[in-house]
Amino acid sequence: MICCKEKIKYVLHYVKETFKDYSVQYEIFGFFGLLSLILRNVTESYSHILYSYKHHVCFKKVEAYLRGRVIHKYHDVDKIVMYALFPWLGVECINHIHTLWQDHHPCYKDLDGNKSYKPKDEVEWTEAIVDWECARFTKPDKPLNAYDTYLKYYYTSEYTRVIINTLISLGLLNVKTTDAGVVYKVTDKMDYFKYE
């Protein structure tokens, strides 16, 4: 479990890494090289505001469609605020801070740059799976549905049982027991969902 104090240590580490990049850029290319890196980070951050806002709106629509109401009203709003107020940090640093701090992300980047997994009881699985499901509607770089995301990133992890149960409870997965064993089938529930 990562306590608040540990999370702050990680955030400071991510920010320090960004400043280290700035320092290297300044040493190699001088003032204008540093300025170009800062401007690139600011430009990328501002371009991600609309990208993240569209995802936020779609998330609420998908959650209302799957659950009948919106529970996670402020999904990813912290990212939008960081893009607006701290754009010089850059998209990568802001994403690292977001995945560490938010409970709907099962993994984060540790201090050594490796992928670390949060304990399964600390993850908000319903929000995570709705997030995976709606990403395909607003993020061209993330075309997978929730079940395919599970298969690609978490299939052999300790999260399997809780992910499958959440997919079933949201109506995204059907289970059939056959002589050959258990068969999972993705439902057509999202086929009728329209996002505009």
Say what each PLM segment does.
Residues 2-196:
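Metal-dependent phosphohydrolase cores
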